[in-house]
Amino acid sequence: MGSEFVSFKPWLSNDSAFATHISYTSKEEQLTNVTNCTAIENGWVWNIPLWNNMGTGYCYSSDFVDDETAEKEFKKHLGTDDVDLQKIDIRHGRRKNAWVKNVVGVGLSYAFVEPLESTSLASTHLLISKLIEVLQRRKFNLTKFDIDGFNYSATQEITEARNFVSIHYYLSSRCDTPYWKYQTHEREFMHLDDTYPSSYMGITFSSWYKKILYQHSSEHVWDTNDRGVAYILAGMGHKPISEYYLNWFRQEHPDVDKYLDNVYAQWRQYVESISRYVKTLPTSYEFLKEHIYD
């Protein structure tokens, strides 16, 4: 319908991928319930356990590596040359408007943010739900207000997914190749904007990023409700603790360590109880075999 394509290239460098399927060597152990992502020289490798085999692929940037070298890196990671690879060209981004006239773009017809199955499924489901909600709100009596609202919401959702993915690169500590050095030391995030179409609301990428910087470097408090950023920070080795403020707090409140020890003890007790319970559950392989594929 002629809706302009808005590229996510300033946030996401990867524009190519090799994909394939590989056989299990130990299905009982390798068939897990998560997608594993592993960083290698010029991007990352996904590993999706399926029932009959594992789907895997290498997502990389042609700005830093050519296809032939990327293929060698991927095969080296897999530990075999005996694989049939499919080359995929990637274009991250979204349409300026998901809803144009009487056509609504959902899923890949609207946007794409790296080959992340869960993100694509979640955003597709969410936009379908939002579309149904808009259509039913006034019994199909639609105005430009309804369409603008849907477009704003669609842009918000896919842009937050983009931000969530991009911050993984920026918070990494890896810098052993030109690709990773660019991601962690040379890429400029501070002044990137264009998060939402309504910039007058003050919601931009730079304001979102500055909020993270402020929480991490000034407040030393992480917002666990901010689209999972706190968990990315923790996974990348960051700690929301300032020894300076903690020592000051100890001087003002001598009993603080006693209370902290109590909190830690309760937390450890909770973690141990969860660990004991998990050991009683079937593995992913056992559950799928018994309830789905048997």
Q: What are the residue ranges of the model-derived segments?
A:
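Tryptophan-centered motif/residue detector
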Residues: 1, 5, 41-46, 90, ...
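Predominantly flavin-linked oxidoreductase catalytic cores and closely associated redox partners
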Residues: 1-78, 128
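Glycine-centered secondary-structure boundary/capping sites
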Residues: 2, 107, 111, 275-276, ...
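Generic preference for hydrophobic/aromatic residues in regular secondary structure cores
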Residues: 18, 32-33, 85, 103, ...
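Hydrophobic alpha-helical segments and their boundary regions
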Residues: 32, 82, 224-226
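Generic detector of intrinsically disordered, low-complexity, polar/charged segments
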Residues: 40, 90, 104, 225, ...
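FAD/FMN-dependent oxidoreductases across multiple families
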Residues: 51, 60-172
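Long, low-complexity C-terminal extensions of enzymes
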Residues: 133-294
